[in-house]
Curated annotation (Swiss-Prot):
Gene Ontology molecular function, alphabetical: oxidoreductase activity; zinc ion binding
Keywords: Metal-binding, Oxidoreductase, Zinc
CDD domains (alphabetical): AL_MDR (cd08252)
Organism superkingdom: Bacteria
NCBIfam families, per database record: adh_fam_1 (TIGR02817)
Keyword Glycoprotein in record: no
Listed SUPFAM superfamilies: GroES-like, NAD(P)-binding Rossmann-fold domains
Similarity-based family: Belongs to the zinc-containing alcohol dehydrogenase family. Quinone oxidoreductase subfamily.
Pfam families per UniProt: ADH_N (PF08240), ADH_zinc_N (PF00107)
Protein name per UniProt: Zinc-type alcohol dehydrogenase-like protein SAV2186
């Protein structure tokens, strides 16, 4: 089997240090399945992980994947050889930048039948992130009618997470205010179903007042938490809930949350697979719901660019595009 990896952490300006490696196909044990990978999607987390310490070389990155089950471990009950599946993997295991990959069945689901592999692979990591935010942290109802009248502000609605989060929020009854800064990203947010699109490069508090937008029940920050921290506190309702997927780079005053009794949560979708939590199966269930909603026409895939072929050159170029932070939707590599 072929893998694309690297020996040491590196920045892109150091040049392309991705290399091709070969190893024997692994044999699945316990609840693992062996997947022949067809397509992968590259995420911002890949660019961050590339610069972290390598504990075992080569480091093979990659999270989103879709492929065909080739073999199953003795404890597997959910899948059979030949099933087409998708998943987001875990950073403490070999990643999907490879032709084959082992993954626990608890974080895998059968892929949608009505869209292509290159489309479906855009959804696992971002979809699970959004599902965990809405259902585990915000605790919205699975009954859309019970969420009517509640609202969410999604900061950076045109990114991979924002794109699917908007669709999920609309599917489950929320009013969605999102942000963008360019005409093409604004149009993309509207295509995803946003009710209102604001400009995040301008004063959001002022825009809320000018458009007479009420304070929101929930805020989902998918970009630069430090930059929007105080703004989010202003725009959330008393007893509201803010969740971010972006770690702080600066010290922030948590006491500022007290006056409104705001709940603040960090969402990290890899927490379940890294720690093998007792409820890890939820990721399988969330992916199943994504498949169902894709097949019913409630969600659309978020793929906007496809590279052909798994190579060091394509992977390096993908990381370059993501680090420019102007990506709309998701970037996919067809293996």
């Amino acid at each position: 089997m072929k893998m694309i990896g690297f020996e040491k952490p590196f920045k892109l300006e150091e040049g392309n240090l991705f290399k091709v490696y070969e190893q024997r196909k692994p044999t699945p044990e316990n609840d693992d399945i062996l997947v022949k990978v067809n397509s992968i999607s590259v995420n911002p987390v890949d660019t961050k992980q590339r610069q972290m310490k390598v504990t075992q070389a080569p480091r093979v990155l990659g999270f989103d994947a879709i492929g065909t089950v080739e073999a199953i471990g003795p404890d597997v009950t959910l899948f059979s050889p030949g099933d087409v599946v998708f998943y987001a993997g875990s950073p403490n295991r070999q990643g999907s930048n490879a032709t084959y990959q082992l993954v626990s069945e608890a974080i895998v689901a059968k892929a949608p039948h009505n869209i292509s592999a290159n489309e479906a692979v855009s959804l696992p990591l971002t979809g699970i992130t959004a599902y965990e935010t809405f259902f585990d942290t915000f605790k919205i109802s699975h009954n859309p009618s019970e969420n009517v009248g509640k609202s969410v502000l999604i900061i950076n609605g045109a990114g991979g997470v924002g794109s699917i989060a908007t669709q999920i929020a609309k599917r489950y009854g929320l009013t969605v205010i999102t942000t963008a800064s360019r005409q093409e990203t604004t149009e993309w947010c509207e295509k995803m179903g946003a009710d209102i699109v604001l400009n995040h490069k301008e004063d959001l508090v002022r825009q809320f007042k000018e458009k007479e937008i009420p304070l929101v029940d929930y805020i989902f920050c998918t970009y630069n938490t430090d930059l929007y921290y105080n703004t989010m506190i202003e725009l959330i309702k008393p007893l509201g809930h803010i969740t971010t997927i972006v770690a702080f780079n600066e010290d922030q005053d948590l006491n500022a949350l007290k006056l409104k009794s705001i709940t603040f949560t960090h969402e990290f979708m890899f927490a379940r697979p890294i720690h093998r939590t007792p409820d890890m199966i939820k990721q399988h269930e969330y992916l199943e719901d994504i498949t169902k909603n894709i097949e019913l026409g409630h969600y659309q895939p978020t793929t906007t660019q496809v590279f052909e072929g798994l190579s060091p050159e394509n992977l390096y170029q993908a990381h370059q595009l993501l680090e420019k932070q102007s990506m709309i939707g998701k970037l996919v590599i067809n293996i």
